[in-house]
A protein has these predicted regions:
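PLP-dependent amino-acid enzyme catalytic core
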Residues: 1-171
């Protein structure tokens, strides 16, 4: 284990830089979503959901909490392989690089900010660039299949409480 004085984006940049060194990559791999091999098992979740839900004859829409956008990228890969997914909704916290991009068309990564949903504290999600590539960098095509919204800590707390109050489910 190694402690880094920084945020997720700082750590991710260190790992990406290390992987540029061919000597290091002979002995090092990554288990996080910058390694596309991680997407393969994640894709099965989307196929399994389809298997369970397709008999309802409704459009399939996935809402995925997103930080580095690896899980939702696996879903987009499943869609590109033919899974009939109508739309993806990526929720983020105040680290709103992707929601802002979908609003203004300018991809402008930021330094990540700490939130209560710390697994989503990513200001420059490396897998979103891959999603853009899967849509041939066509913003209009992306927006036809993909939406993203950001939520503050207060909004997150309110929804968690609402879900618990209405269903007894702890989020």
């Amino acid at each position: 284990a190694l402690e880094v004085d920084g945020v997720f984006d700082d750590c991710q940049e260190m790992v990406k830089t290390a992987f540029l060194d061919e000597e290091i990559t002979k002995k090092l791999t990554s288990a996080n979503s910058i390694n596309v091999a991680r997407w393969l098992p994640q894709m099965f979740y989307f196929f399994f959901a389809y298997k369970e839900l397709h008999k309802q004859h409704k459009d399939l829409v996935f809402s995925v909490p997103s930080g580095n956008f690896g899980n939702i990228c696996a879903g987009v890969m499943a869609q590109k392989l033919g899974l009939p997914i109508k739309h993806f909704v990526a929720s983020t916290n105040i680290n709103d690089t992707v929601p802002n991009y979908l609003i203004n068309g300018i991809y402008s990564p930021k330094t990540s900010k700490a939130t209560i949903s710390n697994a989503m504290d990513v200001g420059n999600p490396s897998n979103f660039i891959r999603i853009q590539e899967l849509f041939n960098n066509d913003l209009k095509a992306l927006k036809n299949s993909f939406s993203s919204y950001s939520f503050s800590d207060d909004e997150t707390r309110e929804k968690m409480q609402e879900i618990y109050n209405t269903s007894g489910y702890v989020t």
